[in-house]
């Protein structure tokens, strides 16, 4: 049986140490490594050793019982949350570690919410019970208050095959048929055991145990019970399907695509349908354990593996018969520019950043052609420091990043029609687009109401491709436009003169001309926050959120604790954790998750500070080009409508 398990926690809760113990007890590694000794098996990258934190979601393998386990040790720092989320996508089961001293911390909430989103069955391990101040019961109360009340203690069960009376009743109370059986006939071990496995797999109950990973207390016992209580049901007889969850370029520059097989089998030299539907041939299958791998000929459903030969699949793509694409919650809200040493050609260095972009698509590496600059999206300052070091180690490039800025976006709040015509000599394309405000955080949606007598289906699809093939600049700050519904009304091509690229020009001009006529709105990223403080600190938090232009829900209380939730601009709240720690003496807790884009609270000031001039953007123009007497001429946006050929 194949099982993929993930170890997740707030930074410094003991994830990597716990993972090392699992690998050691199952003889996957011969020597226990330690984070503080810089020899942990899964923190094999130099930067992880130096910083003492997990940056990459690396995997190990071990055999236990009748199962093969694929273990993923995930980053615990918020700056590397996208890496963690991509790993969660392929987990069959998760183990959340919580320190018995610190309890639930900010990132633990993020982990829990993501596991709920992906419906991953979850176990809890309360770690560091050997430390002064450890309070297991207090942590369990926190879990019940903040996460779930369906916690079940497995520490006193299954050692000799029996289940404690408390656990017997706990299971029966959560299944009406089982409760009736219990009342009539009493406890039946096999029935309860199967029902418990089913409830765990369905994320209806959440087993827990406690121990101290560093001292090897409770880990082996937990593994034994975890193995008994977890089952998977992958089908290798079905056609092959899988998720791409990671991409890396190895030391030779070979693109390595990591896949979780969901069904079927895959062999070397097999063709596989990738993200764009094209078939690509697998040239090599690798089975990784830490930084080492062995080549194999075939994989089956439920296995984690890597392939070479695949170039068109991206992180989050389904492959084989799976045609879905993942949409991730962990989205960067900051943007930074790369600064090179004198003498370095940024365009030549771009290829290295595009490799990083393939490995981590949340970076959204962008080449600003006019400025000859590289920009990328990031979660925070720690990520920038790590990227600087990675780029030097891998590519021998010394770079620094400018101070990151908020990543703004733009949209409109009224319906308009945009017209674009592109007709230099021996070229021709015309497009009419209806542009409407879309739902907030929906992106750009495209549909066509154009008749095939006007434009072929192929050209109509081409218009849609041009709308989503890149980020388009808004008029206010040059930030990406979003939340639009764009409908192709009509268009025209020329049998002789329409060439490749003509419709791209017409589409971009039509979109821009429509924006010129619209009411444009600046958007900024918001956090959803959850803050837990004592009740006598409610007033301070309410005042701070109001000053940060946030919106707060009605506070809730739980004993002497107050729970405050709401949304607030990233720009005004990104450093609030330090302030919270200061006035609560480190006892306040806060979790922040991306809440999408909403109207900017200080749009006028931002527009003035950025100073974007819509009339001199070399990549975009709202003017159209017409042809008369063998010569092309430009017509400004406010005069172009009257000259359109389709009107």
What are these model-derived regions, one by one?
Residues 288-414, 457-516, 538, 573, ...:
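C-terminal effector modules of nucleic-acid-centric enzymes and ribosome-associated factors
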Residues 405-469, 492-494, 515, 529-531, ...:
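C-terminal polymerase-core module
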């Amino acid at each position: 049986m194949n099982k993929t398990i993930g170890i997740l926690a707030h930074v410094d809760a003991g994830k990597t140490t716990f993972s090392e113990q699992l690998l050691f007890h199952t003889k996957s590694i011969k020597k226990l490594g330690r984070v503080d000794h810089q020899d942990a098996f899964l923190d094999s990258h130099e930067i992880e050793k130096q910083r003492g934190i997990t940056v990459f979601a690396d995997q190990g393998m071990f055999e236990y019982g009748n199962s093969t386990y694929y273990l993923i040790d995930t980053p615990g720092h918020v700056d590397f949350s996208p890496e963690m989320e991509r790993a969660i996508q392929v987990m069959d089961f998760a183990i959340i570690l919580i320190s018995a001293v610190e309890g639930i911390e900010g990132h633990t909430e993020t982990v829990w919410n993501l596991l709920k989103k992906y419906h991953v069955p979850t176990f809890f391990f309360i770690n560091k019970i050997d430390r002064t101040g450890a309070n297991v019961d207090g942590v369990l109360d926190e879990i019940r208050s903040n996460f779930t009340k369906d916690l079940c203690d497995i520490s006193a069960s299954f050692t000799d095959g029996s289940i404690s009376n408390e656990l017997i009743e706990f299971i029966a109370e959560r299944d009406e048929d089982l409760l009736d059986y219990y009342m009539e006939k009493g406890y039946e071990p096999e029935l309860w055991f199967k029902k418990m496995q089913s409830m765990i797999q369905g994320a209806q109950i959440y087993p827990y145990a406690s121990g101290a990973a560093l001292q090897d207390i409770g880990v082996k016992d937990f593994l034994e019970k975890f193995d008994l209580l977890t089952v998977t049901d992958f089908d290798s007889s079905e056609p092959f399907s899988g998720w791409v969850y990671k991409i890396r370029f190895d030391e030779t520059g070979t693109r390595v695509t990591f896949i979780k097989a969901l069904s079927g089998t895959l062999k070397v030299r097999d063709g596989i349908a990738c993200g764009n539907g094209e078939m690509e041939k697998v040239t090599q299958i690798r089975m990784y354990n830490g930084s080492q791998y062995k080549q194999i000929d075939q994989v089956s459903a439920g296995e984690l593996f890597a392939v070479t030969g695949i170039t068109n699949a991206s992180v989050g793509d389904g492959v084989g018969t799976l045609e879905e694409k993942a949409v991730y919650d962990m989205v960067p809200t900051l943007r930074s520019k790369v600064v090179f040493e004198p003498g370095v050609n940024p365009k030549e260095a771009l290829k290295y950043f595009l490799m990083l972009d393939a490995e981590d698509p949340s970076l959204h590496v962008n080449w600003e052609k006019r400025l000859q600059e590289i920009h990328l999206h990031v979660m925070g300052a720690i990520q920038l420091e790590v990227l600087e070091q990675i780029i030097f180690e891998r590519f021998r490039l010394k770079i620094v990043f400018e101070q990151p800025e908020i990543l703004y976006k733009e949209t409109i709040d009224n319906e308009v029609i945009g017209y674009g015509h592109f007709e230099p000599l021996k070229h021709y394309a015309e497009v009419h687009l209806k542009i409407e405000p879309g739902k907030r955080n929906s992106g750009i949606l495209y549909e066509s109401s154009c008749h095939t007598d006007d434009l072929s289906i192929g050209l109509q699809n081409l218009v849609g491709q041009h709308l989503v093939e890149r980020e388009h600049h808004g008029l206010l700050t040059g930030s990406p436009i979003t939340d639009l519904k764009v409908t192709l009304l009509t268009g025209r091509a020329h049998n002789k003169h329409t060439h490749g690229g003509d419709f791209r020009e017409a589409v971009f001009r039509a979109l821009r001309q429509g924006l010129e006529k619209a009411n444009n709105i600046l958007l900024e990223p918001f956090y959803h926050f959850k803050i837990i403080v004592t009740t006598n600190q409610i007033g301070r938090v309410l005042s701070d959120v109001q000053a940060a232009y946030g919106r707060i829900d009605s506070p809730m209380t739980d004993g002497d604790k107050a729970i405050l939730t709401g949304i607030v601009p990233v720009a005004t709240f990104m450093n609030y954790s330090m302030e919270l720690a200061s006035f609560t003496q480190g006892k306040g807790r806060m979790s922040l998750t991306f809440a999408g884009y909403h109207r900017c609270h200080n749009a006028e000031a931002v527009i003035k500070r950025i100073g974007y001039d819509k009339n001199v953007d070399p990549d975009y123009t709202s003017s159209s080009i017409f042809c008369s007497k063998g010569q092309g001429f430009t017509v400004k946006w406010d005069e172009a409508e009257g000259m359109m050929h389709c009107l």
